[in-house]
A protein has these predicted regions:
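Gram-negative (and chloroplast) outer-membrane scaffold detector with strong preference
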Residues: 60-126, 192
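Short glycine/proline- and aromatic-enriched beta-strand/turn motifs that initiate or cap beta-hairpins
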Residues: 15-57, 191-197
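Outer-membrane beta-barrel strand-turn architecture
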Residues: 19, 56-60, 93-95, 120, ...
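Glycine- and aromatic-enriched membrane insertion/assembly motifs of diderm outer-membrane
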Residues: 40-92, 155, 168-173, 187
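Outer-membrane beta-barrel translocator domains and adjoining extracellular loop/strand segments
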Residues: 37-42, 75-79, 101-103, 123-128, ...
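Predominantly the C-terminal beta-signal and adjacent terminal strand-loop region
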Residues: 73, 82, 142-204
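Residues on the lipid-exposed face of transmembrane beta-strands in outer-membrane beta-barrel proteins
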Residues: 27-31, 52-56, 87-91, 114-118, ...
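Residues that define the transmembrane beta-barrel architecture of outer-membrane proteins
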Residues: 21, 44-48, 81-85, 106-108, ...
């Protein structure tokens, strides 16, 4: 019994000593597709997508995520590159972590994300527009400092020129997103934890 007690005490102490981290940095890849005047199918014309990401963990359930992505959107009518930068809020349905640094945290959790960004597009009507990314995904902590994520997010833009043409079909509509182009990205990413949290900074 004494041996079991000593082992349990040692495991508990090592769990409490496991560091927490505030920051994640990493990269991902996936597929991007355009929805607009020349395409209404999310799964049609998907092209390679690359993304760099950084996340600041505010607590085990929420994080701020900065993303920079690039890829091509293409149909038979056009072939343009888009590059985006956005800032999002991520909300985890369950507290996220190894369960050692934060009691009750889980290695796996689904999450939702939304934010605000900018999209830069090429072509004859090249320019920039705001985008509103909204999506969902899952994340899994595959190691003490390694995180695997999979997510899908739709970007609602305020431009009808991502495809190089403004309202070529003469569609009548009104409102903030009047006949604007959108695009979505399905991606997987790998991030690494940095910036160890000080556990004694607020202790007397």
């Amino acid at each position: 019994m004494a041996v079991i007690f000593v082992m349990a005490t040692t495991v508990a102490a090592s769990a409490q000593d496991e560091p927490e981290y505030k920051l994640e940095i990493g990269a991902g890849t996936g597929l991007v597709s355009y929805v607009g005047d020349y395409n209404s199918n999310l799964l049609k014309g998907m092209k390679p997508w690359l993304v760099l990401m950084g996340k600041y963990r505010m607590d085990p359930r929420t994080a701020l995520s900065l993303n920079i992505g690039t890829g091509k959107i293409k149909t038979k009518e056009f072939n343009h590159r888009i590059t985006e930068a956005d800032l999002r809020l991520e909300y985890n349905f369950w507290a996220y972590g190894t369960g050692n640094e934060y009691r009750g945290a889980k290695r796996f959790t689904p999450f939702i994300t939304a934010g605000l960004g900018a999209t830069f597009y090429g072509g004859p009507e090249k320019g920039a527009t705001m985008n509103l990314p909204i999506g969902a995904g899952v994340k899994y902590k595959i190691g003490n400092r390694l995180n695997l994520t999979a997510e899908w997010a739709m970007r609602f833009t305020m431009s009808d020129k991502l495809d190089g043409s403004k309202d070529p079909l003469g569609i009548k509509s009104s409102g903030l997103f009047k006949n604007t182009d959108c695009y979505s990205a399905l991606q997987i990413g790998l991030t690494y934890d940095l910036w160890e949290k000080c556990k004694t900074c607020y202790q007397e």
